[in-house]
Amino acid sequence: ETTVTVRAQDDNTGHSRIKLGTVMLNLTAGGAQCSVTVSQSPATATQTMLLYMPGRDLLNFYKQNIDGVLKAVDANVPGDGRILVCYQPNTHSQAEMYEAYFNAEKQAAAFTLLKSYDDFAAADPACVQRMLSDVAALAPAQHYGIIVGCHGKAWVPADHGALSYLAR
């Protein structure tokens, strides 16, 4: 197997992929030919999606969600977008931010650590603000989305106290 890497001289500052050209392959064994279109993704992603899963009570469910994300990632997904996952796999005072991406060399979805937080408190607005600022810095995008994993009172204000079973 041979791997060819093509690198553009300049960043793609536009909002969509740029076609750089076509590579024609002539295989000596069997005389087969094929062409591959080479394109460059934009330097700024079209969308960054953050899957934020605070706390540890739902860790088994969070891991299932992460596995689901990795099953969805392939050569076409997330396309020109990015998928980040931030959760607390080890302790309540620590968090890790990963990126799910397609590893073309291994032809499989992969996970890479982008940032570790050793002093993270999921209920502290300053910690959450810092994490969201890091999302913007580490995965710049035209648009952002967030999915928050939790169990709680949904959209009921916190000062309403516990809900009765019938009100749920």
In which residue ranges do the predicted regions lie?
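Short, hydrophobic beta-strand segments
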Residues: E1-H15
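A short beta-strand micro-motif common to beta-rich folds, especially ectodomain repeats
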Residues: V4, S16-A29
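Surface-exposed loop/turn motifs at beta-strand-loop junctions within extracellular Ig-like
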Residues: A8-N12, L27-G31, C150
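C-terminal edge beta-strand
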Residues: G21-V23, A32-S41
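N-terminal extension/subdomain marker
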Residues: S41-P140
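Active-site-proximal loop/turn and secondary-structure-junction residues that shape catalytic pockets
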Residues: P89-T91, C150-A154
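Mobile, glycine-rich extracellular loop/lid and propeptide segments
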Residues: G145
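A short, glycine/acidic-enriched catalytic loop
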Residues: G152-R168
